[in-house]
Amino acid sequence: MADPGDLESRGKADSYSVAEKKSAPKKISKKNANKAKLEDLKKELEMTEHSMKLESLLSMYETSLEKGLSENIVARNLERDGLNALTPPKQTPEWVKFCKQMFGGFSMLLWIGAILCFFAFGIRAVRDTNPNMDELYLGIVLSVVVIITGCFSYYQESKSSKIMESFKKMIPQEALVLRDGKKITINAEQCVVGDVVFVKFGDRIPADIRIVECKGLKVDNSSLTGESEPQSRAVDFTHENPIETKNLAFFSTNAVEGTATGIVVRIGDNTVMGRIANLASGLGSGKTPIALEIEHFIHIVTGVAVFLGVSFLIISLAMGYHWLEAIIFLIGIIVANVPEGLLATVTVCLTLTAKKMAKKNCLVKHLEAVETLGSTSVICSDKTGTLTQNRMTVAHMWFDKMIVEADTTEDQSGIAHDKGSLTWKSLAKVAALCSRAEFKPNQNDVAVLRKECTGDASETAILKFVELSVGNVMDIRAKNKKVTEIPFNSTNKYQVSVHEQENSSGYLLVMKGAPEKVLERCSTILINGEEQPLKDDVIEIYNKAYDELGGLGERVLGFCHYYLPVDQYPKGFLFKTEEEQNFPLEGLCFLGLLSMIDPPRAAVPDAVSKCRSAGIKVIMVTGDHPITAKAIAKGVGIISEGNECEEDIALRLNIPLEDLSEDQKKSAKACVIHGAKLKDIKNEELDKILCDHTEIVFARTSPQQKLIIVEGCQRQGAIVAVTGDGVNDSPALKKADIGVAMGIAGSDVSKQAADMILLDDNFASIVTGVEEGRLIFDNLKKSIVYTLTSNIPEISPFLMFILFGIPLPLGTITILCIDLGTDMVPAISLAYEKAESDIMKRHPRNPIRDKLVNERLISLAYGQIGMMQATAGFFTYFIILAENGFLPSYLFGLRSQWDDMSNNNLLDSFGSEWTYFQRKEIELTCQTAFFTTIVVVQWADLIISKTRRLSLFQQGMTNWFLNFGLFFETALAAFLQYTPGVNTGLRLRPMNFTWWLPGLPFSLLIFVYDEIRRYLLRKNPGGWVEKETYY
């Protein structure tokens, strides 16, 4: 037991953690200190204040119940411990966030390209009197693209994490305390350890307090534990676990009923809420899968660019080019490899999907989270409100020795039961009179099930059920006016009220409560309207029914009544409920049972089934009771029919659990793990549970345990999605690869910690999100393969220009017209492509093996389709030059004469003279034709990019945005070359319409080639073609 001296030694240490041994001072780095603090916060809550004797507690804190703390001790404690407030975490400055968007990932590649362009232009400016401005224009355009895209991304993600601000909203503003024998109201931040505080209905608890006096106090712990029912408090120490014990109330939870006096035992960061706040804000969530994919893609593109650039630098030097010329070639090749429009395409594609998901009730806070959900392999789902409706409903009744399913439909069209039974009529009447819930006013036109009520969840469920089954409850209560009442308390576990009888001068006593407590006060039971002695055979039937309903995870209440004798209790009798009652609470007549449950949402079983077929493991993680959790898990299919837990096997074999053999234990594919088991669990043990069982339920879990479960799944290599709505979920939401908060029932804290918010709180919406996430990953692959394919016909002219000395077939500005002009809308249109039929039948992608950009994609884009496109471009180029007198064989090695400004009489293949100006005009016409041919072959590339496996004839052409993309790129290409002024500025020339035609056969060839490739993919799954070309 602690002594008073302990208090001084504590200082500001977190006394939840194990006390540290004194050692020689040791310098600890800030990083290590933060890591140690985080590890400490992850530990289970440890405290002894709830188990200490009250005298010892008062002595330790130098306080008393009569006078409270003295002002001297308050001042000392304030100086030592600081204010009762949460320490705000270090905020990332907005300019740092902006710079991350501007220079992170793909943007850096474009910045390097822009800098190289400016460098190349600088070399030209120093060397030439009239330098070519292409590199300068390209550098400027690249810079503008990065700045615009960076600003757009920053704007999209500006709603950054504000977790601690949400916690601040939960902090109570004022507290009523006892100091120097006087009750005073103070700012809650001024509360100190040892303060005696007074709490009443409607207050927010100002700190973690030990209850020392209590009158029916109930607190809403849902934000901390996930339990939707208000929890009663008491002065008794009832559990070793501080979260479970009744004599503690926690900082920022709400008092919903009664009054209490308590002693402050923890303030600020040391409170349970403070620990969760610091844990949530201290966790790093790491890079998203799509960010890692883009990083991987950058490595590939950079590797290819640098390899080609350096190779041709060496080749050009070996061929006798001047070193300055060779460096310009190097820069040109590297820049030509940069897909300038891809950053904007990826950002826009993710934004479009985010908007699509918002229409389906998934609000995405961070763009990259769109794809993360599609990569998810494990979903750790909360139970209350996500899998269930967060609305207690009467599910079953037991009367006349039968279990009957309750009909809670609005029009009473569900399963019918005998409403003519006199027992049922008595049970319904008593349920109506016992329920203290009431409908809020001005809701006459609202359906019963949608009406708002005052009262706790169970009372509300009874009120609505009786209203639907019998009729107007308020009329029943008005005709049977309440005379007196003994409220429910945690000791008696029942509630009693006495009512005037309708059309009679007598009184009716009614009771509801824990079935075993109600039954022990009864001597008779009503069966088929007749009162009969309560015999053993009836009690046995009752016990079986009680066990069955309890086994379904339902909350069971018992009901009884007693007609008070008129001669002993005449009209006007004064009933006493304090101390000794003057009316009987024994020898009552038992009526039956009502059982309630928070029912599963209708769409959830189908959603869980879809997850299973998509290879996603759904794990339930809840703060609720294991029996309830297991029942809901079975109801929604998380534990599927036929799969058993170890307890089920032992029950079926009728043997003790410990007697199960290893083989029998291994045959249990499902398991329900109590949070207590996770308290001191080693990583290896948790990993074994996660590996050995396909269907898992974690019940009675703390925030720290939820976090441990997420980390355990991530150790297995899983991409983890976590759903939650309470403050207790925020650390797990933050740590998960994608945190999904509830929009309706979710706390502000959980919403800020999450990456995505479900606007309808429905688990089925997550499955929709998974499908959209998988679809955008597929469609991003299609956009990238489409965009990268045109890189080869863009790079190869430059390489031919260097290697074979031909006139430049494609200019730098023309490349920009493709990457930032004609290719942009078609690439974005692929984001609208519908899912291929197998999208939710395949397993989640493996982040290590299944890359966004892999060798097969590069091989197809560069080595196959890209080569065909380059051939088409050169075919058109050579045709036009041949038509103008320069045969292909004559062009090789002609570059130095062609670009010589002083040579104005260059002879062509047929002996005609060409001035420098004439040559440049035909060169620009050839570049325009090359550009136009790329657009024509990109038609086929866009169409084949629609699917990765299916035939176009299976997929169809129903993507109207893509159809518009085909028209757009054609119209834009025509506009750029035929509009006076625009064509001059972009160094394009209007050309004969016949020169659009040479690319058409190649376009058809690309389409036929890829149809055959995909046909072979479908015919021989897993064969050579799939291994080499399926991207």
Swiss-Prot record:
Reactions performed catalytically: K(+)(out) + Na(+)(in) + ATP + H2O = K(+)(in) + Na(+)(out) + ADP + phosphate + H(+)
Regulation of catalytic or functional activity: This alpha subunit is resistant to ouabain.
Active-site residue list: D382
Region (Disordered) location: 1-33
Membrane keyword on record: yes
Compartments, as annotated in UniProt: Cell membrane
Residues that coordinate or bind Mg(2+): D725, D729
Biased composition regions of type Basic residues, renumbered to the chain: 24-33
Gene Ontology CC entries for this record: plasma membrane
Membrane topology: Multi-pass membrane protein
GO terms of molecular function: ATP binding; ATP hydrolysis activity; metal ion binding; P-type sodium:potassium-exchanging transporter activity
This enzyme's EC code(s): 7.2.2.13
Pfam families reported in the protein's UniProt record: Cation_ATPase, Cation_ATPase_C, Cation_ATPase_N, E1-E2_ATPase, Hydrolase
Keywords: ATP-binding, Cell membrane, Ion transport, Magnesium, Membrane, Metal-binding, Nucleotide-binding, Phosphoprotein, Potassium, Potassium transport, Sodium, Sodium transport, Sodium/potassium transport, Translocase, Transmembrane, Transmembrane helix, Transport
Protein name (Swiss-Prot/TrEMBL): Sodium/potassium-transporting ATPase subunit alpha
